[in-house]
Amino acid sequence: MIEKVVSVNKDGMRADRFVKSLSAGIGFGFLQKLFRTKKIKINGKKAEPSDKIHTGDVIKIFATLPEELQQKQENNPKLFEQLKKMIIFENDNFFAINKPSKLAVQLGSKVTFCIETLIKAYPNLQCFLVHRLDKDTSGVLLIAKNQLWARKLTGMFRDNEIKKTYLAIVDGKIKSAGTINDYIEKSFIGNEEKMCVTKNEGLQAVTHYRPLQKVGFHTLLELRPDTGRKHQLRVHCASELNAPILGDYKYNPNALGSNMFLHAYKIFIKPLGIEITAELPDYFKEQISTEEC
């Protein structure tokens, strides 16, 4: 835990800018997560990013700030080479990568290496995450090259002008297409945090699904979310279709193997007319070809 008392020269500063000033290694995503998960308090009360702080306020941060590690990764040529291998689209304003499974997008209390730290290696640019993928989900991830385009792309996601298409292999046979429209909220089952479907509480979640082919005893599904709730596709497959995603240890009680078969296959940025497709991982293609035999 870090405790700081606001000095005179910081009076009137926004809370998020104050926290960012404490460490050059704090990325935008990590900063937002600190506030979202209530890890920052002002005078004992939960802080919001836009809160104004004043002389004498006590700021407590219930996390470790990854300063030294982040500074080592900024403008690191080896890390940039690693990032370049993932890039599948790039223009002057943003780029897209094919994120591998098992690599987290954002820093966390137990995550010290992730996409957020990799993009710091991009020479002479401050890059910004504009959306997220779960650690075990692979596929298209957009990254802005400046604040202006971070705001623009974030706005397009908010206004549903960026359409996402996922591919998943699920346990069970899905015979027809359909749309799931319900509500999702966080709950705790034992000591484990999970997202659960509810009738009319929580946040609305809408997913369109379509079976593409049988894969042995499984089904290759196309999933198109209209909303971006946490674990939305995983919960909808498990709870509403009764067909949890293969390898999903959180929502599939029969999960086996080391990979989750959920891939962000395609993004269409409608206002720009840009479509970006991410090739399936080898293990995903092998699962399809093996069970077709």
Regions found by a protein language model. Give the residues of each.
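RNA pseudouridine synthases
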Residues: 1-190, 203, 214, 282-292
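Residue-level detection of beta-strand-connecting loop/turn positions
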Residues: 44, 271-273
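Hydrophobic residues embedded in beta-strands of well-ordered beta-sheets
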Residues: 94-95, 192-193, 219, 274
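PP2C/PPM family metal-dependent serine/threonine protein phosphatase catalytic domain
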Residues: 200-205, 251
